[in-house]
Amino acid sequence: MKNIILIGMPGCGKSTLGRRLAGALHRSFVDADTYLEEKEGKSIPELFAVSEDCFRDAEERTIEALAKRESLVIATGGGVVKRAVNIERLKKTGTIYFIDRRPEDIAGDVEVSTRPLLAEGSAKVYTLYHERIALYRKAADEIVVNEGSLESVLEKLTKLAIRGQGDHLMRITGL
């Protein structure tokens, strides 16, 4: 079965929603950033300390590896859209869902100091959002607005994912 790929800003809910979605659909969940750190043997801040290009190269290798697998729910890093090759690879084996969360909600909810690109403060959230929003929309097969309760957003995402996977998943989940 095709992969279900979640893209969006850091702090938009990709990992939280991805874990819950994978459980609901009886699939394996992969957080691409965690996978990257395990494969590279370095943390994301360590890779960024070398350079952003160093990190983006590692991210590209990660996406190449994950795109070769099937039936996963993948939460990507927020900047995966910065390299078109990543999106091309992901689209070949999956459906891409943009988790769109307002920058003011991210800034008010996320510990930005733990995220390398947001370490400059919450103002960076707005800058990144405006830099990337067109890339997220272009890459997405579906857009899921992350507002309201986690359960309501998860329900919307689950229904879209099931529809995107066809009748086989509807029979498995009973939806």
Which residue stretches match the model-derived regions?
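Conserved glycine(s) of the Walker
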Residues: 13
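NTP-dependent small-molecule kinase module
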Residues: 16, 20, 24, 69, ...
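Post-Walker A helix-loop "phosphate-sensing" segment adjacent to the P-loop in P-loop NTPases
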Residues: 23-32
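ATP-dependent small-molecule kinase phosphotransfer cores
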Residues: 31-80, 84-88, 135
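Hydrophobic anchor at the beta1->P-loop junction of P-loop NTPases
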Residues: 6
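P-loop (Walker A) phosphate-binding loop of NTP-binding proteins
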Residues: 9
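Short glycine-rich anion-binding loops that position phosphate/pyrophosphate groups of nucleotides
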Residues: 78-80, 102-104, 149
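A glycine- and Lys/Arg-enriched "phosphate-lid" helix/loop adjacent to the NTP-binding pocket
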Residues: 93-134
